[in-house]
Amino acid sequence: MRLAVIGGGWAGIAAAVEATAAGTEVTLIEAGRVLGGRARSVSIDGRTLDNGQHILLGAYRDTLALMRRVGADPETLLERRPLAIHDRSGFCMALPAWPAPLHLAWGLLTARPLSLREKLRTALWMDGIKRRGFRVDPDCSVAEWLDAAGQTGQLRCHLWEPLCVAALNTPAERASARLFANVLRDSLGSPRSGDTDLLLPRTDFGQLLPQPASRWLGQHGARLRFGQRVRSLSPGDHGILVDGEAFDCAILATAPQHARRLWPEIGNDFAYEPIATVNLEFGPKTALPFPLLNLDGRVGQWVVDRGNGILACVLSGQGNWSVLNDAALVATLEEELRDYTGNQRAGWNKVIREQRATFSARSGLERPKAETTHPRLLLAGDYTWADYPATLEGAIRSGLRAARLALSRN
């Protein structure tokens, strides 16, 4: 079978590797010069940076398995740390490396500054949603869900709402409670304590998957076409035509706005949310007290210590930050970080903005399935994995699913 995979992001990579491993003749077509999509490394001013700062969780089992499959060792490339959330106000919730659910119980019991009453209320709420299988009304927002549960205190401000924005890239007032519940189910609510671990890259994102996958695909006979933007898809006599070239099957693994341009029957376009990553380089001895910090500021959100004095500030969803120009944004973040940088100004900075970084994970959102109106055309991409918001794990799972569906139609 001749299979075209259109789009070389993480979903397209997963689809191409899965199909190639099964002996399929795969052609992977990517408009850019490298694989990786929105999670790739870029060279700027002689520095190798990530196109956007991403954090993986221990629950990303399919992502980790795919890394191993293409020869990228997660144990070497990722630093595994028990989940610990700290913010500038002094809030702290740290989970020990204990079996589940003891790790969560201890983390909640020792979280500060929280009243005993709030800890008990939260423990009962978490137990209740777990007993209900994390099922939530699909039309309910995260804010409405938290209101109904009486989650109105410190944990809402310092944990639930920041986690919501980080995981769904959508403010709690608009974000889907069902998707947020699914994230909690597979992390804090998982029966495996390691699922909550933070997996912090020791290297740039290109070396985690895109570059090893590119080598693996080439070594196993797949054709990689870079710099080719697909202009048309149309039904063929026995398959699908990609820019007039006949394939038995095709997997459309581009971002949804590009997929809809090629195949309008996919349906209505999504609303989108932006993400900015602000890279600030201070002196080499500058370091955060924690690898991950919630700035909890007027503008700043999450900060990741990349080592060697480089701090990556991640700003998700529409907010105060999105109306600031790059210079004003850098100056504001330098001010909010001054307690950790000794009032230094960054000697170098780079702001990377993605205006359509992810679909807006709103309540009641309808997501397309992998199947289309043409039996030989399948979709892949985080927007098609309806169980999750826009995550790398969702992208990987969608690509694997699309490849397996394509193989079943041979």
State where each predicted segment sits.
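Glycine-rich active-site loop/strand segments that organize a redox cofactor
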Residues: 40-58, 126-130
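Mobile amphipathic helical/loop "lid" adjacent to a hydrophobic cofactor/ligand pocket
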Residues: 60-64, 68-69, 73-182
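N-terminal Rossmann-like FAD-binding beta1-loop-alpha1 element of flavoenzymes
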Residues: 2-28
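Conserved flavin/dinucleotide-binding core of flavoenzymes
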Residues: 303-410
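Helical element adjacent to the flavin cofactor pocket in flavoenzyme catalytic cores
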Residues: 183-239, 249
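Mid-domain catalytic core of redox enzymes
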Residues: 22, 228-340, 368
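Glycine-rich FAD pyrophosphate-binding loop
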Residues: 20-44
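Short beta-strand to alpha-helix junction loop
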Residues: 54-61, 136-138, 149, 191-216, ...
